[in-house]
Amino acid sequence: MKQNNYGGFFMENKALNNRLIIISIFVFLFFSALTLKLVNVQIINKDKYKKSLDDIKVDEVYSTSTPRGRIFDRNYNLLVDNVGVRTIYYKRKPETSTKTQIELAYKMADKIDLDYSKLAKTNLKEFYLVNNKDKVNKKITEKERELLKQRKITISDINNMKMERITDEELSNYDEKDKKAAYIYYLMNKGYYYDEKIIKTYASNEEFAYVSEHVKELKGFNVKLEWERKYLYGDTFKTILGSVSTNESGIPFELKDKYLSEGYSLNDRVGVSYLEYQYESLLKGDKATYLLNDDNSYTVIKDGIRGNDIVLTIDINLQKEVEQILTEEIVNAKMNNANTTYYNGSHVIITDPKTGEILAMASKQIVANNGEYKVYDNTPALLTNPVTPGSIVKGASMSVGYKTGAIDIGTKMLDECVKIRNTPAKCSWTKGLGYLDDVKALAYSSNAYQYKTAMKVAGANYYYNGPLTVPESAFETYRKVFLEYGLGEKTNIDLPVESYGYKGTSYESGHLLDMAIGQYDTYTPVQIASYISTLAANGNKYKLHLLKEVHEKTNNEKMGKVVRNIEPELIGTVDLEQKYKDRIKLGFESVMKSLGYGYMGTVPSPAGKTGTAESFYDSDGDGKIDVPTISKGFIGYAPSYDPKFAITVLSPNVRYSTNSEYTSPVNSKISSRVSNKVFEILK
């Protein structure tokens, strides 16, 4: 007989129902409690909780701009300062409607003189649209509205249609006042709504006073003193000092990612070139911080403060003299010297070889304009425009010979033409120099001595008009030593742009001989300045730099205390025995008694090296060098026994290679005058 299980089934059902009842009661009580809590928070104690929220919610707003740090020269002459600029700005209030904004734009159009030439047609259409909403809305068809409802087009598509359908005829009804108001309206709404919008800088006294006296009725318009950079020495060194973006431009597009990642706002004024860019983190000011109150007023939390003042290594009085000398001599050469068809400027760099400090650096370019010559600053070329150095590299070339054992102190060789099969003969600049030792080879700038040394370095077997084979390693032997002097590598000077120069890619034997006399690889003027500085400093290569001191931030006229001194940074040494370094120095001293006589004016105990290079010029601007020219160079230092300064003077394409042998003396004139001026100022 089967057992009856119905009783067990009903017992289980009853237990399940009891559990459901208990859960339902619990859920009911939970939501009842939650409802009571919400009533308490949102109705009964609303003000209490709102106050608590306000206590922990702080709306901090930052001012738009703070003056940058000032820039001084090494003698604390002020180079770059900030000057106040009367500025009218607009900051939209939350309750301000579009209609009110339009009214304000027209009111301001009556009161301020504003150039609206930058008003784009799109901006004018936008102004027309907000002024004629009903009329413009009728330009959208019912079919298009239906497509919008069906989400087949977007509201953005609709707005674009409206803009496209506003006709030129409709816009032609706008007069000058309308256009000025349209431009003001555009400026009022440019960028983020919560930003201060610059409406006009350099406002007149009357405009400034009007806005100041009518702040309440102008609802968002106000005035303040903004700042602009002032250059106390005019255009002297101005290019390298750099530039700062305007209120209107804010962060340039190409620098947007960099600056936004560092916490900047799009409308911030930032350094965009050279030293202003390089030292943006020091020069930028700290913005004032305000607390946004419930009534939209502001309470100052933290005052703004000017950026760090910085002191440069530059001597501005020397810089000014160098630029003046360059300008005078370049113009004189172009107007009065023959064979200067393709000569268009010269370069000068003055350094302290014991520290790497740059005392002056300038390059000037001359351009014919309507029959007259105009001179422009070209100082960035010192960093980016490589030159063929010629014989000025022979000090480094001698180092290669000594280091490899190819030559030694007193090694003599006959100065004679070298001829490799199927190539033209390679000779010195003049004949009859005879047998020369290492010092006289420098003094008389013997090419043959360097050719023969290079062949020894390469382990090559040479005979006149025979084949010559050299290993690639010989090129690298030269380049390695040249690098120790700073030739062929970036100097990493504290400026944002610099190039390497050109490194030849052919390893033909003749090119090794060319390299030994500075006719193969090319170097930037700043690399050549590093080379002569290293040689003058007994083989110690100090990093070239322009920053000397950083001072703490302050709003006072007086500079803050020094927070950072830039110490000389030794970045390398020339691996060469002292006796050989002394021999090269002796050769450089001998140069100044022969080919280099007068190149350093009347400066006592000079040492240096002249250079002549066969170069080429792109005569038609097509990117191809097509005209053979001659370039001149000079490097030196003084006094030879305790160098106080090193000088680099380069004049590319100074002679057009015609049948005439005449070469303008512009390079020696610049070098002589500048050297005298340096000694006069520094002694």
Model feature map: region roles:
Residues L78-D81, R86, A288-I305, I314, ...:
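Beta-lactam-recognizing serine transpeptidase/beta-lactamase-like catalytic domain environment
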Residues K2-Y277, S281-Y298, K302, S346-H347, ...:
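Membrane-proximal periplasmic segments of bacterial cell-envelope enzymes
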Residues E557, P665-K683:
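Short, gly/Ser/Thr-rich active-site loops of penicillin-recognizing serine hydrolases
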Residues T96, Y116, S245-E254, I407, ...:
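Short helix-capping/linker segments at secondary-structure and domain boundaries
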Residues N653-I670:
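A short acidic/glycine-rich loop-to-helix N-cap element
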Residues E95-D115, I325, V375-V393:
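Short, solvent-exposed cationic patches
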Residues K99-D110, A209, E213, K238, ...:
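Solvent-exposed, polar/charged alpha-helical surfaces in well-ordered, non-transmembrane soluble domains
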Residues E196, D295-T341:
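Conserved, well-ordered alpha-helix/loop/beta-strand core segments that scaffold catalytic motifs
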